[in-house]
Swiss-Prot record:
GO biological process: translation
Entry GO MF terms: rRNA binding; structural constituent of ribosome
Organism: Mycoplasmopsis pulmonis (strain UAB CTIP) (Mycoplasma pulmonis)
Function: One of the primary rRNA binding proteins, it binds specifically to the 5'-end of 16S ribosomal RNA.
GO cellular component: cytosolic small ribosomal subunit
Similarity annotation: Belongs to the universal ribosomal protein uS17 family.
Keywords: Ribonucleoprotein, Ribosomal protein, RNA-binding, rRNA-binding
Pfam families: Ribosomal_S17 (PF00366)
CDD domains: Ribosomal_uS17
Subunit structure: Part of the 30S ribosomal subunit.
Protein name: Small ribosomal subunit protein uS17
């Protein structure tokens, strides 16, 4: 029987990189209200493992689900999609 890769992949921006090998990524999730059908934005913050400390604040990154690394870290950095603009 073939095993299917069902890991979640999320794209968001880095809002904190203070801790060693850890980044906090804010992911915007758009939902639709079940009764009123209005779309609204919900922002969730995920702690992700960054082994080489590459990501900086403002970068757009892709994180993927992995085994639990600590109490709050269940994602790891997959790749940096876009670097933060300098001077802002």
């Amino acid at each position: 029987m073939e095993r299917i890769n069902t890991r979640k992949a999320l794209v968001g921006s880095v809002v904190s990189s203070v801790n060693d090998k850890t980044i906090i990524v804010a992911v915007d999730i758009y939902k639709k209200h079940p009764i009123y059908s209005k779309r609204f934005k919900k922002t969730k913050r995920f702690a992700a493992h960054d082994e080489q400390n590459k990501a900086k604040i403002g970068d757009i990154v892709k994180i993927i689900e992995t085994r639990p690394i600590s109490k709050t870290k269940k994602f790891r950095l997959d790749k940096i999609i876009e670097l933060a603009k300098e001077g802002n």
